[in-house]
Amino acid sequence: YPHILVHNNDKSVILDKIEKEEWARLIFENTKKRLAVYVERHKTNPNWILDRYLMNRVPGKRYTHFVSDRGGTKLVEYKGDAPVPTIRVSSHKRTPITPEGKPYVAPKIEDVIPQDTSMTMNLLNPSTKQFERVDPQQYVSKINREINELAYEAAVLYWLTGDESYARFAADILDQWVNAAVWQYPIEGPGRVGYLDIQTLGDEKSKPLILAYDFLYPYLQEKGYSLKNYDTVFERVAWTLSFRGFATNNWFAAESSTLVAAALSLSDKAKRDYYLGFYLKNDTVSNGCGQLSLPSAAKIWFTPDGHWKEPGGYHN
């Protein structure tokens, strides 16, 4: 470890580049600067960041099963009760929109209520400049993703610097996440729904933590963090992205890096090869959903000169 994006023998090359290349030094220094307040606070108040992770915290409502509507647009039912808080799943595939037709302003991590148990949030209406109580919808995943990305960046900085304050910050977030997600199951619904997000596309928001695990594994072992639940959670991510998500547009391609990261993180070689096979050679498409392997994707979705067969303005 690490073994997905880099290996340990790459570290000296990266550090040399940081020392000699201005662009690399700026990325390194700006990342440290961005993380400094979180990592420093974590030394004396680790619950600050953990309590702002959006979870189902109320006993009796620590949901384990989620059901979407027939179109996979929104959640319509919550079931089960875990012995610990579970990860909140975005209730809708879209961001919340004001009556004036504009997106509400998403709160910063600092503005999230610690250990919030409500299913709604006070969000700023940019038109009226007033806060309104609404369902945060996709902002649930957005907020958690921002915390996931902080953990990933801290894990990389730990690997590069050896500073254990980065490792502890990232490891505590990762530990809370995996021990919550292990109680949860892929959403019940059509082929577009995901595991920890209403859409399979949204499950890529877990990728930063999967990659953080790769950088943190020796630290997690050394400090006695439980590792027993990681394989279960990583396999659920890999399974979801292998057999769900649209294969009739760019979804399968957008999801593939998360699928590969989850598969490469599995400790069982047979399972690792099984899920990697769906990226490398075996299609799983059924009723328009699943994973197209690289050979099929190249044949179906790329022009002879290597262009993706969707219009350039698709995302505008």
Task: Put a short name on every predicted segment.
Residues A261-N316:
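A compositional/structural signature marking long, glycine- and acidic/polar-rich segments
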